Amino acid sequence: MASWEKEKELAHLHQPEDDPLPDLSLLLDMDQFEPTEGPDSNPGAEKIYLQLQVAPGDPSEKTYKFGYEDKEAQNPDLKMRNWVPDPEKMSKWACARLILCGLYNAKKAKELLKMDYDIHWEQSKEDSQYFEIEYHCKMCMTVIHEPMPVSYDKKTGLWIKMGPLRGDIGSVVHTCRRHYERCMSALPSSGEPLKPRVRANPVRRYREKSLIVADRPKRSRWGVAPREQPNTSSGDAMALMPGPCGPFNMDPPGCLLERVPGSEPGTSEMALAMSGGPFWEQVYRDSISGPPTGPSEN
């Protein structure tokens, strides 16, 4: 068989996504190479030899290099991991602090920074406008996910939260503090570290929460839910309004004492009525007008 016929048979081994080969003759007689030969003498094993070398650096940086770098090279508008909006004016150090100040107040952001977590942000798969934050523990490599997504506002140059539902979504500060204290106090262990509870995608979870909050009935100004009767015996809302019998008046409730006999302060009838009545005073010999007169065992 001629050499060109052999090359034609071996052409199906070369895939379009592979590196272009200047000459298919390199694929001829590949089975004759010894497995112990180095990359210089074996052209087919050079690429595998480079991949098997242990690259120095942080594991998260390796993940970015082999998992995100190719995707970003294919689409220049796609910024997936640790995206810095303006590299000329901002660094990753400053960008992480602006993200924390957008998520929390300055006191909580300072607390998160003092705990020395590796902060990473990744573009959301649900909506490319938002980014999801991760806190990587340096002592046990545990990953804690931030429940609130953030987005970058190009007009103001700030990172902002997805919405105002911080109370419904929850905070990650307490979880990070508890995990940090546990790692600092625990002895070194070879076992697998404790993982936080797995939550749903932050963007999708926030949208579902916003629908629940939108359907929730809002309370009125005076503390009564709409379309509900006030909690009074007669069903009259007068007790919730400002007036002589309402809770917003500082005057003595004279209208409540009109039906009490001898309602003037300091009278014996008033003292008897407030002490429990004649039966109470007759049996227990107790009255607010003076000390109890009965024995202690009664």
From Swiss-Prot:
GO terms for cellular component: host cell nucleus. Keywords: Activator, DNA-binding, Host nucleus, Transcription, Transcription regulation. It is found in: Host nucleus. One of its GO terms (molecular function) is DNA binding. It holds the Pfam family Foamy_BEL. One of its GO terms (biological process) is viral process. It comes from the Viruses. This is Protein Bel-1. The gene is bel1.
